[in-house]
């Protein structure tokens, strides 16, 4: 299975990674084009475009200015250890063994507004450029136009290399829109996670994000090769509910947290 997840806004470039093993992003030429566009923006432009505070806008203007390949362990960090957020809390990369890292490299990909598609151990430098940003660029008026079919082609390439034809979408809608579903060369599975609140099961964003990370880790660890095997997922109290599920959207429920 090939798992797709979103990146995180929160970054950690302070703590050292647990391994020196690293790879390079495959779409750095395109990233450089976007950096060149972003360097034309003033902090005020960035604040307006990204709807962020002046402080965060200034930080990201500096990041765009400082962004500079080649990436090394001195000026960059592996994506899976740099991203911090609910999905990454669930994934818990800081406790990966060497064999689990190798499995992650094969079965996990991170969608990114700046880098397109990342392997977990790809080095990245700090940035903030969400996929939904309406950044005018040489290809159009937003990042979906910029990336076009490029990300989809890389997803298909990774899918072939990992051995089966199942893509598990654990990314947000904003990021998954960068993938052309009609061009995917495999079957697409989009798990749904619902938590019980006041007697009703519904998708609760915070819990669902962490659950996506838990499932990504489960796939990396257990290497399922069928949707049926995926339904055995049972981390942190979730369980498969056949009645609410469809063949392409397995539903996992969790009873109310006490």
UniProtKB/Swiss-Prot annotation:
It comes from the Bacteria. GO terms for biological process: response to hydroperoxide. One of its GO terms (cellular component) is cytosol. It holds the Pfam family H2O2_YaaD. InterPro entries: YaaA. Belongs to the UPF0246 family. This is UPF0246 protein Sfri_2896. It comes from Shewanella frigidimarina (strain NCIMB 400).
């Amino acid at each position: 299975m090939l798992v797709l997840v979103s990146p995180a806004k929160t970054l950690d470039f302070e703590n050292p990674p647990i391994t020196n093993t690293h790879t390079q992003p495959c779409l750095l030429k395109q990233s450089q084009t976007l950096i060149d566009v972003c360097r034309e923006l003033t902090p005020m432009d960035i604040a307006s475009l990204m709807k962020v505070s002046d402080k965060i806008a200034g930080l990201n203007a500096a990041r765009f200015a400082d962004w500079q390949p080649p990436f090394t362990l001195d000026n960059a960090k592996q994506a899976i250890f740099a991203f911090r957020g609910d999905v990454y809390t669930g994934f818990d990369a800081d406790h990966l063994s060497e064999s689990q890292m190798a499995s992650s490299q094969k079965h996990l990909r991170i969608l990114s507004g700046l880098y397109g598609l990342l392997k977990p151990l790809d080095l990245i430098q700090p940035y903030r450029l969400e996929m939904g940003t309406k950044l005018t660029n040489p290809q159009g008026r937003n990042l979906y136009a910029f990336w076009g079919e490029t990300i989809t082609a890389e997803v298909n390439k990774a899918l072939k290399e990992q051995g089966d034809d199942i893509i598990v979408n654990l990314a947000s809608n904003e990021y998954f829109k960068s993938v052309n579903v009609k061009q995917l060369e495999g079957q697409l599975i989009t798990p749904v996670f619902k938590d019980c609140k006041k007697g009703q099961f519904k998708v609760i964003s915070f819990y669902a994000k962490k659950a996506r990370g838990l499932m990504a880790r489960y796939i990396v660890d257990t290497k399922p090769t069928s949707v049926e095997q995926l339904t055995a997922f049972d981390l942190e109290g979730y369980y498969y509910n056949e009645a609410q599920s469809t063949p392409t959207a397995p539903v996992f429920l969790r009873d109310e947290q006490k």
